[in-house]
């Protein structure tokens, strides 16, 4: 067998000191085993730990854990320098050696404890008392001047608070560190035995089949550690029995340690607090050891324990007086009862009274069993221990003494019986010998050997005879009888057992787990069973037995949770065990209702406990339906109604001679005084018997319904009628018990009816049976309501404790009835005086208004709050059922049986509001009431805060009207906390604050799990409520500053809660996340939000971050890790700069400032930072859980977004980058993932890929700024396969799934739509089954219908889950698209400019095609897909532009052009308000592609023809059609702009640009006739001319500031902006580029129309120019220079001299413009100003490119016209334009290039861009110009035009000269 190593138990020192491995302390193991769901138990770390063989040895030999063995050599090996080089190891070694010597343990164990303290130092710091700064914040939050805050502030102890810095310095000292080490040592000792105790309970008593991993772990541990077989059926008893003596020895050691402190421990450490902790630790260890020993003994049932074990045990009990030697201190009072209970249980278990009595009756026990009765020595020790304890008055010994007296009594009887038989036999032998003397001697030889049977030898003395003789009990049993009398006098033993049963029960007062308690109570039950033959049926044993069964359980403890059958044995034995059933159960039945409580309590307890055992539960309810006997006080009125019978038997039997009415006269006629009710008649002939000698109590053999009888008696009690009855009226206690029993049984029936195979009608039948004897206008619910009304209306002073108990029981009954007849309960609550009504205040506050909250008042208040919560739940969950009405709803219940029919929504809303008001009253009073214990306060705060939380959640989870009835109540709660009056702000917050303080000051306990659970539930309820309030305020847009301020002030408490209990970690982080998010959004635009780190303080913040950055190590629960990472991301995103810096750098601001220096930036990411932890996880991103991976990536991406330096920090971690690249490189197609792992896995995969893309994009962006991106971008290209496949095509949406689901849902649930379950955004949505539709709400609302679950779970629940998963996938794919878009844009900027990246260019073009193809597919109508389509189009446009800029577009664009065209044609309403932006984007894409087509195709044949045909189609279906439509819309817009359609001048400009691009495509010039026909078919020419003619009255929908509104802007272009005139001429200008079209324009009289237009008149004005003061004049100049002159040129070029006269005539229509063009070109100082009407006023001489273009066009026109005039001077008029002067000016500008550069002004954004671009070198200075090369593109273009003007003019002048 391999040697066991402790590597798992104590990991290597290096890993522990660096934090790579967290030691699994026994405290962590114990806390994990305390979890209700045992979720942490299946974590890999803990599972490995528990399966470790070394740990198994420790479990079986607990003394080895802290044994004082010298392991110095092993210690040195573990701490040697070769094992670790981490700093601080010397201190660790010194502390370990000190601890080992101080408390006498081995060095290795001490080392483990010191390392645990080292790793939990942040916990230790956070659980220190609050600093003065923290106390000040808490006082401010509580309201220092508020009298109600005194109870809360008293918990702070402000006088002892010290400064945070002083506290930290003290915390770092050696003395404090060693105090913490000692505390850790004691904690580990307590936790070890607690962990073993919990583990043994889990192994032996957990119900199998609940969780596969748990079952596997349980089997492995039972097999490996305790030698069970594979089926867990045949355990090795020897292994089990060794645990009992082992842990009993540990108890002995605990007793010794409890009586003395460590001898070598320094005196400075022996403080009062340490002494108390030492004592409590020893006792706690003893209690858990006792529990382990008891469970081991219990598993050995029913065998005798070895007599050696009994001998040792009772010797220990004798020496310690049943542990009273260490339990007699007040400071350990809470530990005393658990210890005493287990001591008694173990003693009784060892005495084994059942088997002992059987043994004393000659029971044959199996071979190998050693009864302790065979050892007189053991018996003597038992007797001595019991006698001494009883004589010393030890209460724990009384049950043992009682059992021992029964055993010794039986021994004495056996001894006396054998003695009498021996004496009788001796006498018989003596007489026989005397007679033989007279017989003849001759017969002697013939005598045979006699049979020895019955001889004295056969009556041997029993082994215990020696014990009896030694103790002188052989003849005198009086000493033992004295012991029994001491035990039973005044019912002491029964009282003790009742108290122990409470400690061993299942309520919050129980000290142990239910399994241990149930088995221990079974031992006490056995004792009562065995004593039943000696002690008659009487109050003490009966009520002790009921206490053992009930253990304090009340109505609210009823549950249908499954439990192991062995745990229910204490209940089932009341039915199955013959003795118990005969002596107790049947006695209680037969004495009912004369003795009321035993039977009622028995039914109540058994009905509640046996819910999951249907057969047994039916037996109990059967007693109530068919009670066999009726025991009553005989009414004298019945004296003539019976006759005696069976007189010879002297049994006092009788027979009724007439019918007897139990609630009326007994006359033969049986008058029907109430004809409308069924009467309780005992028929004639019924047999009975008088059962008492004194009094006349009779038991009638009359089977009846106890339910109906109870209902009648409650009615009589409620009405306070005086009835001639055979039974006395119920007293108040009986009334309370009766109602409680009915409520409990009804609740049990309701729970059973919902279980598989249950009867849905059973609860209703129960109510009907209880109402059977009532008048027909009443039922049991009416009786309960009348009872409440009668009690509530009484004055406060008249209500005593029992009456309040009745009221509480009635509220419990209403709660039980709520599940059966909710409409009735709501109707009653609307008129119940407990809560406020329309014109009355609620009386609940009056009844509970006293400061002293004694038991009955507390029960009433708790019951009321729980009832209110159930009412709110029922209102929320029944929303669909109430709307079903009387329609034929196919469900579990038919429409006729709908319990909500007739319920008014108004009533529900009004009652809910009253409940909210009552809840607030109770909530505010919880700080002032004096409770019996803080536990009661915790229960009430938990319930009332939970009620308010439910209201907020129910009202805001859904976006529909389904929960609108709760909206007023929720609004009342929210407004009370968010916008309270100034005086009530702190008052509202005090109970919440008190909860946080109580959670911090309450120490962790390994006992009383119920109390720990209640406190945890209280705290988590408060935290969840605060979170919901913040979320609701943010969602509703309400102010939340008061609550936000209080929470920030309480941040020091919130940060400490996870250190107090790990259960609080997740809810605290959720609250802090909501707090920083809401505060960050509220502070937008109004300054910085409050600083979380500022309120925490630097030291507390550092400890808090250290605590939570462990991300639930070592358990690694995914849900906790996700919550933690989301909190970190929220801090990063919401302007918590200081806290964010601490997360990212691992240093507080103070530490960062101390670092300083030049290396500050390089050292920002510390080893212990959260960012470093994130990158550590991302190194293993492939193996990381997908949910945690999403959360980690979200944090990293947020850090890079808000803190750019982190981008370089991530980039430096090459392993992280490589891991992310490898992750996306290995991703499978979502379709494959869905088939293998489901839609959720595909969604998370896509979301992670999106985050990875964002990360790479941000890295590329910042690297590009440093010109380092090209290499990384090139590497990434190889990893883009997943993005290229899935980045654009959001194919996940399953339209048929959602359509069919919505249709089927509406058909199944009339009046309700599936969208009614759409989740609001008040809580962040999470990918998964509950993403879009609130599945948990639907489960509550629709669970009543059979179709919701469906056959084999295939109903609407499954469909909703599938729909949510599908929408999760869509959401993830949309995120993937946007991230891919971001990454792709960065890649194109880095790679496209390089020609060698042609392969990447093809990939980019592939993405463009994917975008266009995706948009042409059928899209769902949801807005998200509309937005997505627009985004795809935008991405395609950007990519095409970048491809074009890089000259990377393909030469053959046929396919691309076809895609764009089909995408454009697919737009149904291109100029609709929703589609117009998208249509514009497509037009821009078309323009870019057409520009690429202008370069020609690779093959001049077929492809050219195809492109030409496509271009012609575009001209027809896009250009001409859109131009006409836009022109019409412009006119309509001007008249009526209410149709929602808004066009812009840019649209016409875009169409013109497309026209230009189309006409530029090679080969289109050969299709002029087709183009002309297309344009003519759409009347484009006329439309353009009309648009120009109306331009002065058509203004753009969104005018620029320069052309903004004046009253005359619609008719005066001098003040408006006639932009449409320019656009119309530009469109005609592009058409005129084709000669055929230019000729058509001229023939249609275009020039005449232009000259005659109103706009032409404005163009003739003198203020027209490029630098005009208003937009109209500037636009007129643009029309002249950019449109009219080029248009005239095109027409002149097309028609030549034919049109020259008309062109010249048009030019002469604008003499001012002709003259001003010459003046504008003049250089500064070129000529003196002249007084001329046509001249422009003097101005600062600047020149623009448009002005140069103007003279260039005029130069060409005038020269061509001059040539025509030379041939035909008569027809062609002269155009007056000073060309010579212009030439002179041009020469000047060309020679003075510096002046030109200074005076050249850009007019538009494009020219501004040219000015910033370097010149291409295409135009340089000409020799003789005296100038140099151009510096920018704008200058270059201007020089080119000037050179062109010079060439034209010089040529013209030379010709003239010639």
From Swiss-Prot:
Keyword match Phosphoprotein: no
InterPro entries noted in UniProt: Nucleoporin_Nup188_N (IPR018864), Nup188 (IPR044840), Nup188_C (IPR041634), Nup188_N-subdom_III (IPR048883)
One GO MF term attached to the UniProt entry: structural constituent of nuclear pore
Major localization class: nucleus
One CC-aspect GO term: nuclear pore inner ring
One Gene Ontology biological process: RNA export from nucleus
Keyword terms of this UniProt record: Membrane, mRNA transport, Nuclear pore complex, Nucleus, Protein transport, Translocation, Transport
Superkingdom of source: Eukaryota
Subcellular location: Nucleus, Nuclear pore complex; Nucleus membrane
Keyword Protein transport among UniProt keywords: yes
Membrane-related topology note: Peripheral membrane protein
Protein family: Belongs to the Nup188 family.
Oligomeric form and interacting partners: Component of the nuclear pore complex (NPC). NPC constitutes the exclusive means of nucleocytoplasmic transport. NPCs allow the passive diffusion of ions and small molecules and the active, nuclear transport receptor-mediated bidirectional transport of macromolecules such as proteins, RNAs, ribonucleoparticles (RNPs), and ribosomal subunits across the nuclear envelope. Due to its 8-fold rotational symmetry, all subunits are present with 8 copies or multiples thereof. Part of a tetrameric NUP188-NUP170-NIC96-NUP53 module.
Function (record text): Functions as a component of the nuclear pore complex (NPC). NPC components, collectively referred to as nucleoporins (NUPs), can play the role of both NPC structural components and of docking or interaction partners for transiently associated nuclear transport factors. NUP188 probably plays an important role in NPC assembly and organization.
PANTHER family given in the database record: NUCLEOPORIN NUP188 (PTHR31431:SF1), NUCLEOPORIN NUP188 HOMOLOG (PTHR31431)
Protein name: Nucleoporin NUP188
Species whose genome carries this gene: Chaetomium thermophilum (strain DSM 1495 / CBS 144.50 / IMI 039719) (Thermochaetoides thermophila)
Gene name for this UniProt entry: NUP188
């Amino acid at each position: 067998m391999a040697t066991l190593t402790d590597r798992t138990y104590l990991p290597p020192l290096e890993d522990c000191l660096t934090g790579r491995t967290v030691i699994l302390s026994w405290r962590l193991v114990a806390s994990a085993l305390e979890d209700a769901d045992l979720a942490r138990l299946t974590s890999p770390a803990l599972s490995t730990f528990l399966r470790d063989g070394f740990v198994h040895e420790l479990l079986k030999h607990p003394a080895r854990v802290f044994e004082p063995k010298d392991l110095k050599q092993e210690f040195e090996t573990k701490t040697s320098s070769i094992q670790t080089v981490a700093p601080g190891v010397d201190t660790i070694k010194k502390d370990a050696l000190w601890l080992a010597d101080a408390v006498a343990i081995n060095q290795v164990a001490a080392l483990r404890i010191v390392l645990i303290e080292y790793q939990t130092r942040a916990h230790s710091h956070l659980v220190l008392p609050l600093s003065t700064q923290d106390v000040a914040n808490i006082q401010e939050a509580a309201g220092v001047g508020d009298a109600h805050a005194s109870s809360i502030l008293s918990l702070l102890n402000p006088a002892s608070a010290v400064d945070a810095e002083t506290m930290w310095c003290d915390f770092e000292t050696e003395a404090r560190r060693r105090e913490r080490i000692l505390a850790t040592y004691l904690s580990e000792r307590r936790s070890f035995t607690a962990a073993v105790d919990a583990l043994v309970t889990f192994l032996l008593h957990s119900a199998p089949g609940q969780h596969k991993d748990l079952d596997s772990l349980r089997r492995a541990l039972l097999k490996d550690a305790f030698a069970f077989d594979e089926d867990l059926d045949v355990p090795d008893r020897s292994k089990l029995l060794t645990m009992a003596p082992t842990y009993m020895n540990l108890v002995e050691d605990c007793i010794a340690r409890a009586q003395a402190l460590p001898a070598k421990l320094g005196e400075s450490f022996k403080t009062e607090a340490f002494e108390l902790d030492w004592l409590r630790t020893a006792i706690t260890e003893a209690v858990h050891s006792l529990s382990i020993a008891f469970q081991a003994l219990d598993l050995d049932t029913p065998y005798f324990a070895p007599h050696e074990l009994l001998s040792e045990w009772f010797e220990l009990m004798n020496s310690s007086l049943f542990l009273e030697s260490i339990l007699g201190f007040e400071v350990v009072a809470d530990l005393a009862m658990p210890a005493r209970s287990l001591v008694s249980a173990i003693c009784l278990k060892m005495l084994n009274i059942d088997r002992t009595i059987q043994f004393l009756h000659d029971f044959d026990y199996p071979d190998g069993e050693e009864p302790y009765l065979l050892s007189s020595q053991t018996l003597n020790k038992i007797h001595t221990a019991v006698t001494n304890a009883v004589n010393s008055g030890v209460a724990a010994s009384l049950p043992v003494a009682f059992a021992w007296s029964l055993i010794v009594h039986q021994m004495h009887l056996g001894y006396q019986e054998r003695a009498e038989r021996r004496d009788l036999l001796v006498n018989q032998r003596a007489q026989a010998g005397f007679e033989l003397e007279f017989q003849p001697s001759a017969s002697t030889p013939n005598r045979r050997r006699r049979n020895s049977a019955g001889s004295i030898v056969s009556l041997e003395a029993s082994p215990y005879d020696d014990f009896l003789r030694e103790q002188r009990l052989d003849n005198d049993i009086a000493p033992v009888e004295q012991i029994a009398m001491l035990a039973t006098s005044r019912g002491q033993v029964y009282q003790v057992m009742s108290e122990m049963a409470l400690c061993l029960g299942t309520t919050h007062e129980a000290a142990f787990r239910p399994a241990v308690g149930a088995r221990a109570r079974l031992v006490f039950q056995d004792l009562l069973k065995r004593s039943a033959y000696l002690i008659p049926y009487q109050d003490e044993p009966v009520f002790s037995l009921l206490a053992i069964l009930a253990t304090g359980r009340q109505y609210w403890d009823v549950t249908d949770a499954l439990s192991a059958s062995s745990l229910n044995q204490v209940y089932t034995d009341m039915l199955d065990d013959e003795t118990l059933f005969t002596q107790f159960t049947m006695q209680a039945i037969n004495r009912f209702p004369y003795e009321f409580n035993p039977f009622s309590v028995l039914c109540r307890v058994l009905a509640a406990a046996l819910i999951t055992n249907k057969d047994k539960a039916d037996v109990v309810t059967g007693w109530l339906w068919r009670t066999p006997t009726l025991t009553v006080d005989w009414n004298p009125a019945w004296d003539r109604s019976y006759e005696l019978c069976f007189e010879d038997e002297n049994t006092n039997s009788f027979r009724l001679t007439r019918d007897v009415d139990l609630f009326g006269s007994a006359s033969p006629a049986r008058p029907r005084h109430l004809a409308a009710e069924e009467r309780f008649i005992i028929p004639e002939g019924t047999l009975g018997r008088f059962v008492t000698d004194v009094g006349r109590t009779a038991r009638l053999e009359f089977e009846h319904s106890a339910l109906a009888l109870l209902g009648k008696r409650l009615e009589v009690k409620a009405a306070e009628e005086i009835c001639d009855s055979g039974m006395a009226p119920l007293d108040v206690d009986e009334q309370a018990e009766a109602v409680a029993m009915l409520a409990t049984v009804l609740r049990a029936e309701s729970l059973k009816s919902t279980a598989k195979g249950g009867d849905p009608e059973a609860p209703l039948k129960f109510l009907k049976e209880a109402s059977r004897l009532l008048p027909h206008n009443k039922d049991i619910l009416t009786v309960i309501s009348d009872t409440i009304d009668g009690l509530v209306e009484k004055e406060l002073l008249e209500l005593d404790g029992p009456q309040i108990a009745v009221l509480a029981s009635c509220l419990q009954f209403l709660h039980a009835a709520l599940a059966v007849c909710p409409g009735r309960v709501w109707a009653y609550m609307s008129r119940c005086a407990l809560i406020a009504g329309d014109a009355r205040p609620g009386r609940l506050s009056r009844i509970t208004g006293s400061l002293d909250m004694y038991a009955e008042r507390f029960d009433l208040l708790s019951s009321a709050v729980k009832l209110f919560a159930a009412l709110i739940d029922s209102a929320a969950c029944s929303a669909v059922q109430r709307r079903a009405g009387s329609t034929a709803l196919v469900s579990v219940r038919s429409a006729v049986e709908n319990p909500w029919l007739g319920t008014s929504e108004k009533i529900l809303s009004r009652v809910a509001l009253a409940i909210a008001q009552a809840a607030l009253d109770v909530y505010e009073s919880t700080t002032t009431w004096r409770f019996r214990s803080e536990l009661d306060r915790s229960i009430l705060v938990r319930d009332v805060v939970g009620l308010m939380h439910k209201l907020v959640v129910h009202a805001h989870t859904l976006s529909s009207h389904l929960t609108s009835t709760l909206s007023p109540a929720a609004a009342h709660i929210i407004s009370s906390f968010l916008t309270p009056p100034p005086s009530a702000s702190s008052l509202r917050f005090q109970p919440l604050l008190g909860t946080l303080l109580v959670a911090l000051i309450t120490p962790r306990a390994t006992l009383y799990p119920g109390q720990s659970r209640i406190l945890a539930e209280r705290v988590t309820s408060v935290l969840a409520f605060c979170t919901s309030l913040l979320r609701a305020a943010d969602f509703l847009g309400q102010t939340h500053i008061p609550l936000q301020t209080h929470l920030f002030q309480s941040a020091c408490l919130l940060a400490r809660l996870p250190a107090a209990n790990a259960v609080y970690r997740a809810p605290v982080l959720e609250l802090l996340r909501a707090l920083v998010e809401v505060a960050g959004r509220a502070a937008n635009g109004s300054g910085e939000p409050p600083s979380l780190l500022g309120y925490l303080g630097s030291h507390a913040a550092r400890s808090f971050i250290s605590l939570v950055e462990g991300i639930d190590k070592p358990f690694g629960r995914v849900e906790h890790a996700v919550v933690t990472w989301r909190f970190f991301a929220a801090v990063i995103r919401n302007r918590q700069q200081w806290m964010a810096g601490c997360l990212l750098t691992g240093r507080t601001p103070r530490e960062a400032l101390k670092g300083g220096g030049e290396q500050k930036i390089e050292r920002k990411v510390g080893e212990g930072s959260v960012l470093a932890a994130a990158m550590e996880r991302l190194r293993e991103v492939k193996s990381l859980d997908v949910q945690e991976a999403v959360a980690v990536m979200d944090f990293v991406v947020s850090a890079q977004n808000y803190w750019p330096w982190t981008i370089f920090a991530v980039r430096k971690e090459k392993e992280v980058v490589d891991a992310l690249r490898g992750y996306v490189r290995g991703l499978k197609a979502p379709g494959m993932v869905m088939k293998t792992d489901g839609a959720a896995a595909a969604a998370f995969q896509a979301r992670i890929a999106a985050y990875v893309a964002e990360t790479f994009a941000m890295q590329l962006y910042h690297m590009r700024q440093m010109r380092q991106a090209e290499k990384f971008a090139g590497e990434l290209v190889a990893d883009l396969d997943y993005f290229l496949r899935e980045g654009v095509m959001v194919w996940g949406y399953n339209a048929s799934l959602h359509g069919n689901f919505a249709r089927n849902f509406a058909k199944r649930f009339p009046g309700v739509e599936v969208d009614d379950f759409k989740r609001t955004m008040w809580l962040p949505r999470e990918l998964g089954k509950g993403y879009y539709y609130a599945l948990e709400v639907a489960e509550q609302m629709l669970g009543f219908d059979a179709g919701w679950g469906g056959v084999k779970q295939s109903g609407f629940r499954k469909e909703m889950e599938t729909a949510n998963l599908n929408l999760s996938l869509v959401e993830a794919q949309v995120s993937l698209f946007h991230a891919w878009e971001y990454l792709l844009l960065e890649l194109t900027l880095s790679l496209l400019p390089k020609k060698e990246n042609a392969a990447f260019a093809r990939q980019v073009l592939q993405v463009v095609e994917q975008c266009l193809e995706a948009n042409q597919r059928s899209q769902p109508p949801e807005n998200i897909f509309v937005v997505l389509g627009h985004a795809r189009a935008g991405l395609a446009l950007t990519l095409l532009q970048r491809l074009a800029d890089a000259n990377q577009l393909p030469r053959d664009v046929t396919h691309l052009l076809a895609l764009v065209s089909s995408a454009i044609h697919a737009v149904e309403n291109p100029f609709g308000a929703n589609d117009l932006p998208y249509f514009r984007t497509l037009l821009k894409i078309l323009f870019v592609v057409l520009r690429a087509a202008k370069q020609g195709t690779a093959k001049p044949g077929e492809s050219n023809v195809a492109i030409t045909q496509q271009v012609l189609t575009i001209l027809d279906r896009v250009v001409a059609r859109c131009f006409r439509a836009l022109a019409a819309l412009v006119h309509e817009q001007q008249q009526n702009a209410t149709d929602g359609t808004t066009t812009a001048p840019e649209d016409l400009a875009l169409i013109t640009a497309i026209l230009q691009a189309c006409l530029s495509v090679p080969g289109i010039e050969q299709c002029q006739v087709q183009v002309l026909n297309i344009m003519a078919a759409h009347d484009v020419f006329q439309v353009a001319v009309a648009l120009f003619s109306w331009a002065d009255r058509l203004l753009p929908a969104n005018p620029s500031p320069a052309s903004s509104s004046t009253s005359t802007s619609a008719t005066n272009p001098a003040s408006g902006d006639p932009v449409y005139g320019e656009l119309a001429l530009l469109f005609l200008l592009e058409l005129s580029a084709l000669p055929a079209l230019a000729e058509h324009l001229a023939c249609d009289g275009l020039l005449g129309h232009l000259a005659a237009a109103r706009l032409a008149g404005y163009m003739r004005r003198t203020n027209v120019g490029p630098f005009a003061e208003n937009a109209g004049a500037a636009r007129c100049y643009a029309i002249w220079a950019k449109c009219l002159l080029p248009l005239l040129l095109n027409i002149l070029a097309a028609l030549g001299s034919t049109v020259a006269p008309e062109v010249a005539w048009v030019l002469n229509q604008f003499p001012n413009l002709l003259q001003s063009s010459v003046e504008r070109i003049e250089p500064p100082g070129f000529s003196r100003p002249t007084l001329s009407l046509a001249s422009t006023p003097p101005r600062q001489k600047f020149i623009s490119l448009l002005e140069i273009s103007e003279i260039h066009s005029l130069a060409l026109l005038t020269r061509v016209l001059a040539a025509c005039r030379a041939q035909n001077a008569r027809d062609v008029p002269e155009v007056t334009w000073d060309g010579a002067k212009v030439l002179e000016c041009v020469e000047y500008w060309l020679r003075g290039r510096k002046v030109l550069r200074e005076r050249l002004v850009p007019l538009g954004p494009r020219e501004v861009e040219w000015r910033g671009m370097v010149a291409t070198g295409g135009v340089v200075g000409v020799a003789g110009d005296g100038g140099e090369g151009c510096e920018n593109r704008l200058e270059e273009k201007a020089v080119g035009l000037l050179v062109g003007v010079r060439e034209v003019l010089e040529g013209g002048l030379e010709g003239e000269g010639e």
